UniProtKB/Swiss-Prot annotation:
A Pfam family per the record: YcgL
Segments forming a coiled coil: none
Record-annotated YcgL domain positions: 3-87
HAMAP family per record: UPF0745
Superkingdom classification of source: Bacteria
Annotated region (Disordered), positions in chain: 78-97
Organism expressing this protein natively: Hydrogenovibrio crunogenus (strain DSM 25203 / XCL-2)
Alphabetized InterPro entries for the sequence: YcgL-like_sf, YcgL_dom
Protein name: YcgL domain-containing protein Tcr_0238
Length: 97
């Protein structure tokens, strides 16, 4: 069964996202969480299903968090994760062939 979800991005930190059930909106979130997150900027509403592909997290993990906590916060990728998309340094290129 699909769950209609709203996604928000943080105005304070790049690549920090908050997912909440659309029917609840942001009203049920604590003031502390919203202060830490910063001004939420609405990105998209979508149906969350088990088969839904999300960028950096498993849909089932998001669904469980929404059911238990009422929200899911997707943290920015770590510096190591970001480096995974970078080409190897030039000194390592001689080993390619």
């Amino acid at each position: 069964m699909a769950l209609l979800v709203s996604a928000y991005k943080s105005a304070k930190k790049d690549e920090l996202y908050l997912f909440v059930p659309k029917e609840d909106g942001l009203e049920k979130l604590s003031d502390e969480l919203l202060v830490m997150f910063g001004e939420p900027q609405h990105v998209i509403d979508f149906d969350l299903t088990e088969k839904r592909k999300l960028a950096r997290v498993d849909a089932e993990e998001v669904k469980k968090a929404l059911e238990t906590k009422g929200y899911f916060m997707q943290m920015p990728p770590s510096e190591i994760e970001k480096m995974g998309d970078m080409p190897p340094p030039p000194e390592h290129l001689d080993n390619i062939f």
